[in-house]
């Protein structure tokens, strides 16, 4: 519940028994996520989503030993809904709460088992390229809890650049997947943009976004 998706999963001994996601189509008309609408949708969705996750897992809520929740980063209103629900659920069942950094969860989600026979385990240390809607980072992962950001965007995240470019082209939200699909069908050598020179492991997408907007403006004039 960090942004516009309400999600719940049931995990036993590292094996995922269920995973339910409810996406919010209400933001499409606005070309981006509206925080207030996202918060309201989370309030409507969170109980049905959690109930469905328990149902698919074949687990009763009384059997739960703990409840994990997203503490951030994310939209404040969305985070408050998830946190408040987790606190109430924890108190009612008398079970502990586990707060989770959702970016760390992105890194470690690849190692959640889907069956008892899945023995895939992380080989620490390793490097992770984390690219999500609002974040773009290079992370050195030393252990489950020890992670070090060694590089990141100094301006826009890759997802933000995708969505902003998609919006000016009149593509529906979210535009990233649509641009990705169209790019695979197009000519990769049709246009060339200058690549920013950033020291170290950091990177920048704002210049690339601006170059694209100028190109689009000039093409429209023609």
Outline where the language-model segments fall.
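N-terminal beta-alpha supersecondary unit
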Residues: 1-73, 102, 106
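A short helix-loop
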Residues: 1-2, 17-19, 122-123, 131, ...
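Nucleotide and nucleotide-moiety/phosphate-recognizing core
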Residues: 60-63, 85-102, 109-111
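Short glycine-aspartate micro-motif
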Residues: 66-68, 78, 121, 126-130
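Short Gly/Thr/Asp-enriched flexible loops that form oxyanion-binding sites at enzyme active sites
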Residues: 69-93, 112-113
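Active-site nucleophile and cofactor-binding loops and adjacent substrate-binding regions
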Residues: 70, 81, 97-105, 130-131, ...
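Conserved phosphate-binding catalytic cores of ATP/NTP-utilizing and phosphoryl-transfer enzymes
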Residues: 100-126
């Amino acid at each position: 519940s960090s942004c516009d998706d309400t999600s719940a999963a049931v995990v036993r001994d590292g094996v995922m028994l269920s995973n339910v996601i409810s996406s919010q189509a209400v933001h499409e008309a606005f070309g981006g996520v509206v925080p207030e609408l996202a918060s309201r949708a989370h309030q409507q969705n969170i109980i049905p989503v959690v109930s469905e996750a328990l149902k698919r897992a074949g687990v009763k809520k009384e059997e739960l030993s703990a409840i994990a929740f997203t503490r951030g980063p994310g939209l404040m209103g969305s985070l408050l809904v998830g946190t408040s629900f987790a606190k109430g659920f924890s108190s009612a069942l008398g079970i502990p709460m586990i707060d989770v950094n959702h970016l760390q969860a992105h890194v470690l989600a690849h190692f959640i088992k889907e069956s008892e026979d899945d023995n895939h385990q992380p080989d620490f240390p390793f490097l992770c390229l984390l690219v999500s809607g609002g974040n773009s980072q290079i992370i050195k992962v030393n252990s489950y809890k020890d992670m070090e950001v060694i590089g990141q965007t100094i301006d826009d995240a890759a997802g933000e650049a995708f969505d902003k470019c998609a919006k000016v082209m009149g593509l529906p939200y979210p535009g990233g997947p649509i641009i990705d699909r169209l790019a695979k069908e197009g000519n990769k050598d049709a246009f060339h943009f200058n690549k920013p020179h950033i020291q170290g492991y950091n990177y920048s997408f704002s210049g690339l976004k601006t170059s694209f907007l100028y190109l689009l403006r000039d093409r429209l004039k023609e």
